[in-house]
């Protein structure tokens, strides 16, 4: 009996620990970039959907931006189309663009919306074409001082914040696929990390969170010690020193850009940890790395 009572008291203490964070975030908007292993592993996917739904029920307004690289790769492989990347960006010809749009908008987006709705949320799936949400233009990557044409790869020109605010501040959970639209109606494939940061900037989100397949930032990659909090200046220094590289660079640069444009806090989370979103937001210690100015 006493053992059972201790467990109940422990649960109550967890709720009490979360109370000040719930009060602080009530009515605020949190942008979550959902990607990595948490999109592939069914158990992790289920926990993420539970976290996002719970946020909405306690008065926080989550906006989800998702990737879909592995699924795009899978479809392209079946079509015998070889994927090419330049500085981590997918070279996107017309066929690849059609596949990316089909997978991101027609499959991945709708699966996430369905899962959130099954959890009791009211999710709405949209992409940058809807309501001119993401106005984009063609992106050229600079390689060795030369401009490289990546095809239908875009960069964000502007975000129609009104669309997202209207949904998020009501009872809905917007789920955004990173497809943008040009002035002439051309669709563009845009890096999902960049889209998440641009959305967070446009709506002045309270938090921007990137789910990744790493524990967090480290001064030494061989160390088990995670940096719990770090300044933007320190992050830039780590990039210069080669301690941050690859796919982590657009994430941390997105964090810094968002902070400079009014986002209060940014986070790099290990999406492989069950309920990582709740653990970061509603516990004293948190997990992962918080980046601040």
From Swiss-Prot:
Alphabetical list of Gene3D superfamilies matching this protein:
Acetylglutamate kinase-like (3.40.1160.10)
- The protein's site described by Transition state stabilizer is found at 33, 251
Identify the domain of life: Bacteria
**Which biological process annotations from GO are given for this protein?**
arginine biosynthetic process via ornithine; L-arginine biosynthetic process
Record's catalysed reaction(s): N-acetyl-L-glutamate + ATP = N-acetyl-L-glutamyl 5-phosphate + ADP
Cellular component per GO? cytoplasm
What are the protein's GO molecular function terms? acetylglutamate kinase activity; ATP binding
Its UniProt pathway annotation is:
Amino-acid biosynthesis; L-arginine biosynthesis; N(2)-acetyl-L-ornithine from L-glutamate: step 2/4
Residues involved in substrate binding:
68-69, 90, 189
* Record EC number: 2.7.2.8
Any Pfam family from its record, for instance, is: AA_kinase
Q: Which UniProt keywords apply?
A: Amino-acid biosynthesis, Arginine biosynthesis, ATP-binding, Cytoplasm, Kinase, Nucleotide-binding, Transferase
Could you tell me which InterPro entries the record lists for this protein?
AceGlu_kinase-like_sf, AcgluKinase_fam, ArgB, Asp/Glu/Uridylate_kinase, Glu/AcGlu_kinase, NAGK-C
Compartments annotated for it: namely: Cytoplasm
Task: Name the NCBIfam families on file.
Answer: argB
- Family, per the entry? Belongs to the acetylglutamate kinase family. ArgB subfamily.
Q: What is this protein called?
A: Acetylglutamate kinase
Q: What species is this protein from?
A: Caldicellulosiruptor saccharolyticus (strain ATCC 43494 / DSM 8903 / Tp8T 6331)
Q: Provide the organism lineage as a comma list.
A: Bacteria, Bacillati, Bacillota, Bacillota incertae sedis, Caldicellulosiruptorales
Q: What gene does the UniProt entry assign to this protein? A: argB
